[in-house]
Regions:
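N-terminal pre-ligand scaffold of iron-sulfur
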Residues: 1-83, 117-134
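Secreted/processed peptides and extracellular or luminal domains of membrane proteins
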Residues: 76, 97-100
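Acidic/polar residues in short coil/turn loops that connect beta-strands
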Residues: 60-61, 94, 102
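Short secondary-structure subsegments characteristic of cysteine-rich extracellular domains
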Residues: 84-88
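Polybasic, low-complexity binding patches
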Residues: 89, 100-133
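Cys/His/Pro-rich metal-binding microdomains
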Residues: 71, 91-92
Length: 134
C-alpha cells in the first residue's frame, strides 16, 4: 500500500469545489494539483499521492476520493493511472471504466471486479484531508 496524504484548501485554492458542483474533480500527482483538468498549483513537500495519483470527485454522495491506479493493470504488474472522462475514470492501457458519479468507482466493462481503491476523506473547516483507509 502506497501512502496518501493530500490536503485541499477550499478557502484559498479551490473556492468553488463544493458538493453542489456535481461532477467536478481535483487530481493530485507528481505534476501538481489540477481542477477539472486545469493546473492549479504544485504539490507540497508533505503530499503523498498513492500508487497512481489521487482523484477527489464530487459524486451523488458528496466528496469521494480514490487512488487512480487501475486495479486491472496492477494485477498484471503494470502501474497505469486512469484519466478522468466525465463521470468515469478510464484506464488508457486496458480501457476499463470506473464509475465515479455513483460514488462507487465500480468497473463498468467487467475486466476486473475490484473498484478503484477508496481513500479516506476528512472535511475539517475549510480543508479536506485525504489519506489511505486504515
Amino acid at each position: 500500500m502506497y501512502p496518501v496524504r493530500v490536503e485541499i484548501n477550499l478557502k484559498t485554492d479551490f473556492t468553488d469545489f463544493t458538493p453542489e458542483n456535481f461532477g467536478a474533480y481535483i487530481t493530485v500527482n507528481e505534476e501538481g494539483y489540477k481542477k477539472n483538468g486545469t493546473f492549479v498549483k504544485l504539490p507540497s513537500v508533505m503530499d503523498a499521492w498513492g500508487y497512481g495519483g489521487v482523484v477527489v470527485y464530487i459524486s451523488l454522495n458528496g466528496y469521494d476520493a480514490y487512488d487512480m491506479a487501475c486495479p486491472n493493470c496492477a494485477l498484471h504488474g503494470k502501474q497505469t493511472s486512469c484519466a478522468i472522462d466525465g463521470f468515469y475514470a478510464v484506464c488508457p492501457d486496458c480501457g476499463e471504466k470506473y464509475d465515479l458519479a455513483s460514488g462507487t468507482a465500480a468497473p463498468q466493462k467487467g475486466l476486473v471486479r475490484e473498484t478503484l481503491r477508496r481513500l479516506r476523506i476528512m472535511p475539517s473547516g475549510d480543508k479536506l484531508t485525504i489519506t489511505q483507509q486504515q
